[in-house]
Amino acid sequence: MSSKLVNYLRLTFLSFLGIASTSLDAMPAGNPAFPVIPGINIEQKNACSFDLCNSYDVLSALSGNLKLCFCGDYIFSEEAQVKDVPVVTSVTTAGVGPSPDITSTTKTRNFDLVNCNLNTNCVAVAFSLPDRSLSAIPLFDVSFEVKVGGLKQYYRLPMNAYRDFTSEPLNSESEVTDGMIEVQSNYGFVWDVSLKKVIWKDGVSFVGVGADYRHASCPIDYIIANSQANPEVFIADSDGKLNFKEWSVCVGLTTYVNDYVLPYLAFSIGSVSRQAPDDSFKKLEDRFTNLKFKVRKITSSHRGNICIGATNYVADNFFYNVEGRWGSQRAVNVSGGFQF
């Protein structure tokens, strides 16, 4: 493949990432060359650049490698919402006496999260199957990774996103009050599986794709309800857990700067959902008979992020990676690992 064609492909790929990001929530992409990291250092490996092995022996070609990794993912803000919530826009009372006819007019609305952050700390085991051939389109160069650890999350959203205006008729429009709900969890168990594949390489650059799925269940720390009509703060509690699910797919390009630093650019797209326990507001409903709540799912669907990061090879069997992502999430991911 000519150098002009290679440069053209790189430019086209980077342009595609920039254009797509304006129209498209997602997890960290990671380095596209992860399946062959860190065994690509020229001086320490005494091999051609990014050529892991020149042997054509079948056993050598199929031999894999194991990585023990650590990682932390920190989301500072995120775009998500509760969709299609029926909200009362007007209340009409007809008739007189103790039981007048009350008619409510409703309209569906979407409520955005006002604030949201998430911290994840995990250890991981990754098994990679490198491709020993010199082919530009490798058959292998694939890795499978499993992560386990702890996840803690916080979010704040308008109270009406969790209000239930349809179970009982309202006496007046004044009962449709504005306010805020805050939910904070403790650290709960999280697991994550990912698959990464190098789909093209030329000895200097890599193009890779990946898919990730993350699931967490976090015990509730506190739930705060604050209505503007009543400035008193009410704390609800629950023995349930805050469920969190996320999936993501990504595509990325990396080109090494020198023998020890490998920067990359990637684009990721995915979906996130959060679900608070159904009994989150039971105590508030028992105390205030005119307040009814319905816990609804918070989602962020098919939104994308631009991911920019770099991998540093400290030694022939150790590496670390720092990545930032912008878009529907503003987040930083830090990871590293040892190869065995």
UniProtKB/Swiss-Prot annotation:
GO biological process: monoatomic ion transport
Family matches, as InterPro entries: Major_OMP_Chlamydia
Molecular function terms from GO: porin activity; structural molecule activity
Signal peptide interval: 1-26
Membrane topology: Multi-pass membrane protein
Subcellular location as annotated: Cell outer membrane
Protein name per Swiss-Prot or TrEMBL: Outer membrane protein B
Origin species: Chlamydia trachomatis serovar D (strain ATCC VR-885 / DSM 19411 / UW-3/Cx)
Recorded name of the encoding gene: ompB
